[in-house]
Amino acid sequence: MILKRCCEKLENLSLKIAFIESASSGYLCSQFSIYKNTGADILLGALVSYDPNIKQHILHIPRSLILQHSAESKEVTHAMAQQGLHLFTDADIVVACTGLLKPGGSATTEKPEGTFFISIAYLKKIKDIHYLLNGTALERLDQLTELVAQEVLNIISV
């Protein structure tokens, strides 16, 4: 399982990870916490910013950025990762996630249900990723977890 390998690699490198989640509502953080002898050693925690007011008032994401691009966008997710580094000062890696897990939100034909934006901050760089996932909400979250774990593994293995 990729998630387990990712957690073991984080632990071996003594790296700490934190999450700023919207669409995934803390699911990514919970999945990274479940492995014995890794969760407590690698995981700092998470902020779930499902409501745009949390993004604005806690993460200090400008309202204008949200209005211009929507709360579920590459630009807002990138800003969330940047702000996550300020919230989680001991984090080596911050993973931010927005998207459209279920119908509604800012869904369009160009950005349909199942769209996710991920930004991963590590070593003063931020990698932005876009996924379009199929399946039920839970299937999408499980796919997203594995994809994020693989991206983190790729980033820390360079």
Regions found by a protein language model. Name each.
Residues 1-158:
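Short alpha-helical segments enriched in small residues
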